[in-house]
Amino acid sequence: MSDRLTLLRPDDWHIHLRDGAVLTNTVADVARTFGRAIIMPNLVPPVRNAAEADGYRQRILAARPAGSRFEPLMVLYLTDRTQPEEIREAKASGFVHAAKLYPAGATTNSDSGVTSIDKIFPVLEAMAEAGMPLLIHGEVTRGDVDVFDREKIFIDEHMRRVVERFPTLKVVFEHITTGDAVQFVNEASANVGATITAHHLLYNRNHMLVGGIRPHFYCLPILKRNTHQEALLDAATSGSAKFFLGTDSAPHAQHAKEAACGCAGCYTAYAAIELYAEAFEQRNALDKLEAFASLNGPRFYGLPANTDRITLVRDEWTAPTSLPFGELTVIPLRAGEKLRWRLLEEHA
């Protein structure tokens, strides 16, 4: 087994950078590895139109490290009030690459999300016509639904209906966590893809709950049982072009995670490709990592792959116990633990 792995520079097709002073930290972490990233729009207030997306984009560009060529790919936040014309304007901008459907209340800063998918059918029609992908946080939010069943029920009640009603609409099932989602994506048309996080490949709910509650494993969609973890590993390492890298790296300050009512999100951007390499190595599938990390996403979005390269080496190192997050700190996933792969260098 080789101790060195060179890949076309990957992209992150789902990340949260937050806003304000913390951008200096979060942008540096993502730009270290990735050429581009799909930037989640769930700010307060959310990114609802092309003008707001451009403002956020300029703040991200200003936070890039000196010499960085990292490109943020912006996303609109869909609400019950989004208009088809706003989709057409966003598409014409050239820098908005998708729109995100958050069911109201599904995750961090989703209170402004869509209350009923039927309300945005005219918007979805405009997206299909414009060729703009729809990114879906696929969980129902009703109080009578068990948190571990939210994804499966969303598939049955909503996903099937959306892809049948809009067969030409490109749909990304974001951060899938279940074998049910893997099966749905595999059986759907080529217009349906999915992102998978490193933490859902590496961990299951036992890691979060057995022997004490570990708040830094808490995310939404929540970690599932190990059989679902295995299904995700099968999908990611299958070679199927339908599945691609999306970290869902979602930082919260330490005090907001280590609390009586802690926030959902795992911070992985600081070592994302290293974590994915560990997951693929578990399956003896490092030869499949480049397609998953560097090729499948651009192909789905109709963008060229990056041409420069990164190199990973098998060289154990210890993850930091904390990282700066503006004036506060964030505890990264695997804080203080050993990682097996290290990012070495880039090639022109």
Swiss-Prot record:
CDD domains according to UniProt: DHOase (cd01294)
Gene Ontology molecular functions: dihydroorotase activity; zinc ion binding
Top-rank EC class of the record's enzyme: hydrolase
Protein name: Dihydroorotase
Sites of N6-carboxylysine modification: K100
Subunit architecture: Homodimer.
Gene: pyrC
Catalytic activity line of the entry: (S)-dihydroorotate + H2O = N-carbamoyl-L-aspartate + H(+)
Cofactor: binding comment: Binds 2 Zn(2+) ions per subunit.
Pathway, per record: Pyrimidine metabolism; UMP biosynthesis via de novo pathway; (S)-dihydroorotate from bicarbonate: step 3/3
Active-site residues annotated for this sequence: D248
